[in-house]
């Protein structure tokens, strides 16, 4: 028969005089220190609580132990000094059988959830008469919590200035406040049945928030009720010493949170502490159902903070050597002080980001030793133990992890080919860089990693494979790859659904090159998860994106993905196009662009054919100039868009992508500014009836507005953002949106502002036309022109406005499929809309075109008839007669009025 082991946990309280054998031992908890009469003792008397674990074999030995505790009576004299046991109690009774430990509380002691032995590995049973704590012995941690006396907690606020000395229990000011509070509360509570002691446990900031703990032998409900009954007495006693804040005094019987750092607290309490020595900042915790949870933390190593300040001193005259030395100093500090506090994480990410931006702007190169220092720094802050602190940081800086990833990629691109190959394999990050040579033409590129997650020996593998067919053009200089398991835990996951990153995050950077197909292989971290999605981190929208990536194969442990380069018209406002509708959007884009370009060319041909017939009044001439430039601007913009769509979206050695962005931006702006010129013309001819601006002056205004303003905006945009590499997106050839400067606003704001202005102009003009002021009468020709302008503007402006309005929708709600389809549809067919509503809507142009086509048709028919008549008659059957056309007259009339015609008639008087 196997006998279980039993324990009786006993609680002793000693007082030790000067020179006592207990001394100052860290293993013994000092409860409080009192100054006593020096005549009786040579020094202060200290009170200790001693917790003893005593083993017994059966119930008889247990009874003997209980009786022994009862026989212990003060004072006891020891040879090392005067020791007095003031109380001795059994607290917890435990028995162990077959590896399972079960404990119950002794008389007047109880469990204080979640203090049941080891809260993580034990379960508190409350259904029985005596609540018991049950757990497996092999799971217990080194420190466990046993049954305690009944405790009641209380807090109140003192209207005095808080000082950091109140956080130090050894300081004089702490002792002053604590001793005064304990004396007054003890007087108020000493007559309560079961009351044993009261002790100040903490002071918090917020005036001075004092927390105290009352210990008693009665039940929690009885002790709490008694303390509440004498609450007024306690407040009056405290008010004699301190100015209390009204309504701040409260007591509660259950501490939701209680630990050695933040003390006790009830639900939703917040407690702020200064950081420990050597750090600057504060740490704030909130009491939640699971205990104290850190919600804010700014603890930055003092050395790091100083280093961050020193960085600004080298920016003005920075050199590669200075930057390299700075990174080396940062690496040394991190290596000597590896603590990954939230403040340290934020500070390191900020420093690395600043180094990256400075190096990119100054075109610095990064040596192999500097790159090794960067990877060592990254390995430290990507420690899997720091994930909890990353979670806290991401509450304040949501995209700090994205910023880190982008920074590491940018710094990696600064390593010259001559410093490669390099390979840094650390515990939490792997980095590899190679120079590209002609062997890539034959064998392609492969990058493989093997990393072990925390608390497991099973490796997680990953692989990047680029086929040799992707290197058939001029070769890139370098290929950089890196991988990390921790990044998958800290990069934000979309709020939609409960997805999680289930593999390593792998990054491959090929500068100045275009890759159209890449295969990726991932080991699953958790093989039981299903329905994998192949995604990439979208730096433009700061989220996971599946555009251009799809699942190739899935086994129980391995997922294979394929990613390709995709471009659609929808990138003008949003680079994210859901993969489910991408073929539709792409088809709409290119078919629509073909029709649009053809329509615009037709617009220009029609204008060229009938330019002289239409050019009569100043208003008509100016309108034609505007329409021609609108068509021309959109035509060139569409061509440049196609150029941008055919080059690599990330880089191009000749700068074609940057040029495409600039000219697309410029000519799309020109389109809108020429529309604004149309609006101004319309308002001018209606409102200022008797004012006539000179033709050359009106043209000067038109061309300055139509091309001058767009040129200024475009040049300023590229001049401000290109040096910091924030001008264009990394994934598509278009203006950037994700960075702080947001150069895309340099297009969106003017375009939408012009659309809004033109709507207002149309409304004003329509009102003026319906109710003209007395004396304001236009000529018939000018009024017809104005009506034509109004029709064109009224239809053309809403179409263009809606187009870019739906584009804004693709940014705000990138997951909405309707935004992308409508946006692509309206944008792709803009040229066709201009042909219909800007050219064919004009009745004069329509009539001229009809006449031209009719004349051509009649001429062909006449030629055919004459040819038929000649073939029916014999040769020379009629003598030559120079007057054979007598009686036949050809009438042709051309005019400049609205009823212009070109008509050919044949009549006979015979």
From Swiss-Prot:
- Provide the GAIN-B domain boundaries: 437-579
Spell out which residues lie on the membrane's Extracellular side.
20-583, 647-658, 720-742, 814-816
For this protein, the parts annotated as crossing the membrane are 584-609, 622-646, 659-684, 697-719, 743-767, 785-813, 817-842
Domain SEA positions: 148-256
How the protein is affected by changing residue 682 to A?
Strongly decreased G protein-coupled receptor signaling
- Maturation and modification: Autoproteolytically processed at the GPS region of the GAIN-B domain; this cleavage modulates receptor activity.
Please report any disulfide bonds recorded for this protein chain, giving both cysteine positions.
Answer: 257-287, 275-299, 534-561, 549-563, 657-733
The effect annotated for residue 570 to A is: Strongly decreased G protein-coupled receptor signaling
Domain of life where this protein originates: Eukaryota
Effect after changing residue 389 to S: Decreased expression
Result of altering residue 683 to G: Strongly decreased G protein-coupled receptor signaling
Result for mutant: residue 804 to A: Strongly decreased G protein-coupled receptor signaling
Q: Identify the residue position(s) of the site Cleavage.
A: 566-567
Phenotype upon changing residue 830 to A? Strongly decreased G protein-coupled receptor signaling
Q: What switches its activity on or off, per the activity regulation note? A: Forms a heterodimer of 2 chains generated by proteolytic processing that remain associated through non-covalent interactions mediated by the GAIN-B domain. In the inactivated receptor, the Stachel sequence (also named stalk) is embedded in the GAIN-B domain, where it adopts a beta-strand conformation. On activation, the Stachel moves into the 7 transmembrane region and adopts a twisted hook-shaped configuration that forms contacts within the receptor, leading to coupling of a G-alpha protein, which activates signaling.
UniProt entry tagged with the keyword Transmembrane: yes
UniProtKB keywords: Cell membrane, Disulfide bond, G-protein coupled receptor, Glycoprotein, Membrane, Receptor, Secreted, Signal, Transducer, Transmembrane, Transmembrane helix
Which compartment or compartments is the protein found in? Answer: Cell membrane
Family statement drawn from the similarity comment of this UniProt entry? Belongs to the G-protein coupled receptor 2 family. Adhesion G-protein coupled receptor (ADGR) subfamily.
| Subunit-structure text | Heterodimer of 2 chains generated by proteolytic processing; the large extracellular N-terminal fragment and the membrane-bound C-terminal fragment predominantly remain associated and non-covalently linked.
Q: What is this protein called?
A: Adhesion G-protein coupled receptor F1
Q: From what organism does this protein derive?
A: Homo sapiens (Human)
């Amino acid at each position: 028969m196997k006998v279980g082991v039993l324990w009786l946990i006993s609680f002793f309280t000693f007082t030790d005089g000067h020179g006592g054998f207990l001394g100052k031992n860290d293993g013994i908890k000092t409860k409080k220190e009192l100054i006593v009469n020096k005549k009786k003792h040579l020094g202060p008397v200290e009170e200790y609580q001693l917790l003893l674990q005593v083993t017994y074999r059966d119930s008889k030995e247990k009874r003997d132990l209980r009786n022994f505790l009862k026989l212990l009576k003060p004072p006891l004299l020891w040879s090392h000094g005067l020791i007095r046991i003031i109380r001795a109690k059994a607290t917890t009774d435990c028995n162990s059988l077959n590896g399972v430990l079960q404990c119950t509380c002794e008389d007047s002691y109880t469990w204080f959830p979640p203090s049941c032995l080891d809260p993580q590995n034990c379960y508190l049973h409350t259904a029985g008469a005596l609540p018991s704590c049950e757990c497996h012995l092999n799971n217990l941690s080194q420190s466990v919590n046993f049954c305690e006396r009944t405790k009641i907690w209380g807090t109140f606020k003192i209207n005095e200035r808080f000082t950091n000395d109140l956080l130090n229990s050894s300081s004089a000011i702490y002792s002053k406040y604590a001793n005064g509070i304990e004396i007054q509360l003890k007087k108020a509570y000493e007559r309560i049945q079961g009351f044993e002691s009261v002790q100040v446990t903490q002071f918090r900031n917020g005036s001075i928030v004092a927390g105290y703990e009352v210990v008693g032998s009665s039940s929690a409900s009885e002790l709490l009720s008694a303390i509440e009954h004498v609450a007024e007495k306690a407040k009056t006693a405290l008010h004699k010493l301190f100015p209390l804040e009204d309504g701040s005094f409260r007591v509660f019987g259950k501490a939701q949170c209680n630990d050695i750092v933040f003390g006790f607290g009830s639900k939703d309490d917040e407690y702020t502490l200064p950081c420990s020595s050597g750090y600057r900042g504060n740490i704030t915790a909130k009491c939640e159902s699971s205990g104290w949870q850190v919600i804010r933390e700014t603890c930055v190593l003092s050395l790091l903070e100083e280093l961050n300040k020193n960085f600004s001193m080298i920016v003005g005259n920075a050199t590669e050597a200075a930057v390299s030395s700075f990174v080396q100093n940062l690496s040394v500090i991190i290596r000597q002080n590896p603590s990954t506090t939230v403040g340290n994480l934020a500070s390191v990410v900020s420093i690395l980001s600043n180094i990256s931006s400075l190096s990119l702007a100054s075109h610095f190169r990064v040596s192999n030793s500097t790159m090794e220092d960067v990877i060592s720094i990254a390995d430290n802050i990507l420690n899997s133990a720091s994930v909890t602190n990353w979670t806290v940081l991401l509450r304040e800086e949501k995209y700090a992890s994205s910023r880190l990833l982008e920074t590491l990629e940018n710094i990696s691109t600064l390593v010259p080919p001559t410093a490669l190959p390099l390979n840094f394999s650390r515990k939490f990050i792997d980095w590899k860089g190679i120079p590209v040579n002609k062997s890539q033409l034959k064998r392609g590129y492969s990058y493989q990693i093997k990393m072990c997650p925390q608390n497991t020996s099973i490796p997680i593998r990953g692989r990047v494979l680029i086929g040799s067919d992707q290197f058939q053009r001029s070769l890139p200089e370098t290929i950089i790859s890196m991988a990390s398991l921790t990044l998958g835990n800290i990069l934000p996951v979309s709020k939609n659904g409960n997805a999680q990153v289930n593999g390593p995050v792998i990054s491959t950077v090929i500068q100045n090159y275009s890759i159209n197909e890449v295969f990726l292989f991932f080991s699953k971290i958790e093989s039981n998860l299903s329905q994998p999605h192949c995604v990439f981190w979208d730096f433009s929208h700061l989220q996971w994106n599946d555009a251009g990536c799809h699942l190739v194969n899935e086994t129980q442990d391995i997922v294979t993905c394929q990613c390709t380069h995709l471009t659609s018209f929808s990138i003008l406002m949003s680079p994210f196009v859901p993969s489910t509708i991408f073929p539709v959007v792409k088809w709409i884009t290119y078919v629509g662009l073909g029709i649009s370009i053809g329509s615009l060319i037709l617009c220009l041909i029609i204008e060229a054919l009938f330019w002289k017939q239409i050019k009569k009044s100043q208003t008509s001439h100016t309108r034609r100039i505007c329409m021609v430039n609108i068509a021309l601007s959109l035509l060139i913009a569409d061509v440049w868009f196609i150029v941008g769509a055919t080059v690599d979206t990330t880089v191009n050695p000749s700068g074609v992508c940057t040029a495409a962005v600039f000219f697309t931006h410029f000519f799309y702006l020109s389109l809108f500014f020429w529309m604004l010129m149309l609006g101004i013309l319309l308002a001018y001819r209606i409102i200022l009836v008797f004012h006539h601006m000179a033709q050359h002056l009106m043209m000067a205004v038109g061309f300055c507005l139509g091309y001058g303003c767009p040129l200024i905006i475009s040049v300023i945009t590229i001049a401000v953002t290109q040096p910091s590499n924030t001008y264009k997106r990394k994934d598509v050839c278009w203006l950037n949106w994700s960075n702080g400067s947001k150069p895309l606003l340099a297009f969106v704001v003017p375009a939408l502002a012009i659309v809004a202005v033109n709507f207002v102009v149309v409304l004003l003009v329509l009102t003026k036309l319906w109710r003209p002021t007395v004396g304001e009468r236009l000529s018939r020709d000018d009024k017809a022109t104005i009506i034509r302008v109004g029709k064109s503007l009224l239809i053309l402006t809403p179409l263009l406005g809606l187009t870019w309005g739906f584009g804004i929708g693709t940014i705000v709600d990138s997951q909405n499929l309707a935004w992308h389809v409508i946006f692509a549809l309206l944008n792709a067919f803009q040229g066709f809309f201009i042909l219909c509503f800007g050219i064919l809507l004009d009745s004069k142009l329509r009539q001229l075109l009809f006449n031209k086509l009719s004349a051509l048709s009649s001429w062909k028919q006449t030629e055919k008839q004459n040819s038929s008549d000649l073939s029916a008659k014999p040769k020379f059957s009629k003598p030559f007669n120079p007057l054979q056309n007598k009686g036949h007259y050809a009438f042709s009339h051309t005019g400049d009025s609205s009823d212009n015609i070109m008509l050919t008639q044949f009549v006979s008087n015979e």
